[in-house]
Amino acid sequence: MKALKQFLMRLARFLGLSAPPVALDQLADLAGKIEPRAKVEIPLAEPQKLILKDIAAGCRSSGSQRGETIVLFTGLQGTGKTIAAEILARDLGRDLYRVDSQRVISKYIGETEKNLNRLLTAAEEANVILLFDEADALFGKRSEIKDAHDRYANIEIGYLLQQLEGFKGVAILATNDEDNTDVSLRRRIRFVMKFPPG
């Protein structure tokens, strides 16, 4: 166990993270901390700034209620979704971690679920905000069942949605195309912010 902790500490340093508390040890291999910028210029229109303030107020009022702080940022690449997530994290006084979908998704049956469960548990304990960039990779539309693989993929998406709904923290899902996300996911989202092009 001591060797594992030392490995995680080295991994955290390699990823540019400070020495993490126990909960952050679990995050180190599935998400990377986004370091706050000294000054974040807000490239958002005034209505969007107001929406972001409303989202922050809603997150504060939700406290630690399960599933009450799922936020969807939707818009083309380069329209300000990540910067908006940084601003929201700063306003809430929490660290922001970008989830690496490549590390969460596994080709082995049951591993994706375990990884997401471990990630959400660690994020709750550490009280950090998770940014699922390109969320449709994890929470994409369920497909028509043609074989056992499709059936399992649909079951997996359902499980992931349940886990996210039970999460007692702030989860920001960013996607380039809202239509690529599962309909059940969209029903669970409390806040949606659209980022227009250009």
Segments (PLM) and residue ranges:
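Conserved ASCE P-loop NTPase core motifs with emphasis on AAA+ ATPases
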Residues: 7-42, 46, 56-57, 136
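Compositionally biased, charge-rich terminal segments
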Residues: 1-6
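Walker A/P-loop NTP-binding motif of AAA+ ATPase domains
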Residues: 42-198
